[in-house]
Amino acid sequence: MYHSELFQQYGTSYTMRPPHALAPTYPSAGGHHDSYRYSELDVPSQRFDGLFPALEPSQRILGAPPLTPLSLPPGPALGFGQVQPPCETPQLPGNVKMKLENKELWKQFHSIGTEMIITKSGRRMFPQCKVSVSGLEADGKYLLLADLLPVDNSRYKWQEDHWEASGRAEPRLPERVYIHPDSPAPGSHWMKQPISFHKIKLTNNTLDQMGHIILHSMHKYQPRFHIVRAQDVFSRRWGGCSSFTFPETLFLTVTAYQNEKITQLKIQTNPFAKGFREDGMKSKRDRSIRGKRKVISVEQEQEEEEQFQPEGECKRPPLYSGPCDSTLSEELDIGRSLGIPSPNCSFHPITPPTQTPPSTETPNPSLPANQEQGAPLQMSSQTPGTFLQTYPEPPRGASSLYSCSPTDAAQNQTLRPSAQRLPPGYQESPHISHSQGELKIYGTEMGPPGNFNPPSCAVTPSVRLSDEPMGRGFSMNFPHFLPNNKIGLQISGAQLQRMYNGGGWM
């Protein structure tokens, strides 16, 4: 629009210019909406009829309408909880039959009330669905499908010893169809042997992306099987479909078995539950564990009895039990192989009767040099601190307890510890053989208290000359205090100084 007072030369109004006339060869307006057909491209349909026998005549020429998407045969609209009837048209020939192979097993479960476990990750069914078919064309292509339909519109609960309805069912979930992995296959393949649907997995995960069949817990479901002819799969019509159901296969979905009879029946019939049987591996493991526990309890009772036995009847403890097992582990291992006589009761130090030094008497030749004569020592419990307080100073004649000589001191200081051998004055038992790994390290002889120049000295007792206990107050039942043995107690000079100056043991 424009203002008439500004453009007076155009007047108060004006008319539109008429449209230009189109050329006579220009297509009419109807040609813009209808597809243009070139006659030279039209192909006679009868020329290629033999190549496409399954295609419809409307699809054999160019310009035919596009194919519709492939879909299952349409069925009637169903309300909530209504069972979908099997597909009606088209039907396979009436001679196509399906039979449930493990029907007797299903009947056993059905008489009690079959329960199927469902999990988030998916659980297989037992009993499995095993069917056999007959009446198919040997050369025809067929697909076998399976799905699960809700039986009614109720939710169930286990009440004492039976199932009963407890309310309305949950809203129906998207129905999923399980396609047998052998599909499509010729009819001869399906009819030659039973068909198993053991790979079907049930889940309660509504967001499952693994293709498992989604079900609600505590609901009744009915498996349904379909045989679909797949020869004309690219056509707008299916070749035929037949559906089959078996009343014995009805089951309830649970997350844990509610009926104890179902649990026992599945243990007896499921080959994968052999471990739960009385003769199964799980029962054997349980029995073996119970047996081991009994043995352990008996051993514990024996140990408790040994701990409360009197002193005269107590047995020798193991070499690694005692106050010195942490520092003499290697020496005790050597002493075990030397046949050292065992002590009468324990390794605890005894109370010294007197503070007199050991006497020297002629030993009894009828006894070995490394065994005690007379009655066993009376053992009494005493702490190491009390024992050291009794002997603040070394006893008289203590120099005979050490195998160090002044002449060997300088040599031992210059030699490496690995090269220091037994001193010349040491008499070794002829029954004991030498070995490279059983060497002793010796230092020099002890001097007066406080003058301990050598860095270390091996305490080794001299040969006994009397049948009295050597060094009264010293337990001669220790392996490292026995004469003519190969065990040397490595003690540094500073430790010996503190020991005899009253500074405490070690």
Curated annotation (Swiss-Prot):
Residue ranges annotated as compositionally biased, kind Polar residues, are 369-389, 400-411
What is this protein's tissue specificity according to the annotation? At gastrulation, expressed in the lateral and ventral mesoderm. Expressed around the blastopore except at the dorsal midline. As gastrulation proceeds, expression extends anteriorly and ventrally. At the tailbud stage, expression then retracts caudally becoming restricted to the tip of the tailbud.
Question: What name does this protein carry?
Answer: T-box transcription factor TBX6
What subunit structure does UniProt give?
A: Interacts with ripply2.2/bowline. Associates with tle4 in the presence of ripply2.2/bowline.
Alphabetized CDD domains for the sequence: T-box_TBX6
What are the protein's GO molecular function terms? DNA-binding transcription factor activity, RNA polymerase II-specific; RNA polymerase II cis-regulatory region sequence-specific DNA binding
Q: Where is the composition biased (Basic and acidic residues)?
A: 276-289
Does the record bear Transport in its keywords?
no
| Job description of the protein | Transcriptional activator. Plays a role in ventral mesoderm specification and acts together with nog during muscle differentiation. Mediates posterior pattern formation of the embryo, including specification of posterior mesoderm, via activation of the Wnt and Fgf signaling pathways.
Q: Give the record's keywords alphabetically.
A: Activator, Developmental protein, DNA-binding, Nucleus, Transcription, Transcription regulation, Wnt signaling pathway
